[in-house]
Amino acid sequence: AAAPHQKGRQSNGCAVVIRHEDIRRKEREKRTGNIFLFLVDASGSMGARERMKAVKGVVFKMLADAYQKRDRVGMIAFRRDRAEVLLPITRSIEFAQKKLAALPTGGKTPLAQGLIKAEDMLDRLYRQDPLQDPVLILITDGRATNSLNKNTDPVRDALSEAERIGHRHMPIAVIDTESSFIKLGLAKELAQKMGASYFHVDKISEDRLLCIGRQTAYERGQYDL
């Protein structure tokens, strides 16, 4: 429905501009909806507060439509030396508002720990329903600074864990927030290891995140446009 009407629409950076009225569920998604898991870098790197605020906003937007679309959303943040499930997978906007009232940021970047935590949550979801195909959305600049142990390199740890997740062949988007003058391209390398769609954003926003999430689901046939 969206493709024939692209001319004249203002693009927000997606390959296909998607509006609410364009989205029609396939029969299975009408019954079950999609699961979106946000994995967010909340470390002391530039823009952490903006990232967290934008993800919180898009979580609320998705859940506001949950009665109609039956989508569920979860959120993991990583900072200092650990990753934390801030929002277990839910369809309740009231529950999300309670869990996401405070969004702490700062410290080192334990990217590998974040990926491990995401994989643990994915394992639980698959055990509940092997037919589920959750959408993982990783938001980071890729600059891991906290290793899994004293004798390993944090970037290599992260790339190794990214490759493990890539073996799942699931829909993944990596949103690169790197904004420094010298670009290391680590988030792009993560995306390659994960077999993920890659997006670089200069300024993160709720609308951009929502668009990327839906586009990633659409590319795997989970939205019918």
Regions found by a protein language model. Give the residues of each.
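VWA/integrin I-like adhesion module and closely mimicked acidic/polar interface patches used
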Residues: 143-193
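Catalytic core regions of nucleotide second-messenger enzymes
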Residues: 130-132
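Short beta-strand-loop
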Residues: 72-102, 119-127, 151-152, 183-193, ...
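Negatively charged sequence features
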Residues: 1-39
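Short glycine/serine/threonine/alanine-rich loop segments
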Residues: 71, 170, 196
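Short acidic-hydrophobic, aromatic-tinged amphipathic segments that line or gate anion-handling sites
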Residues: 197-204
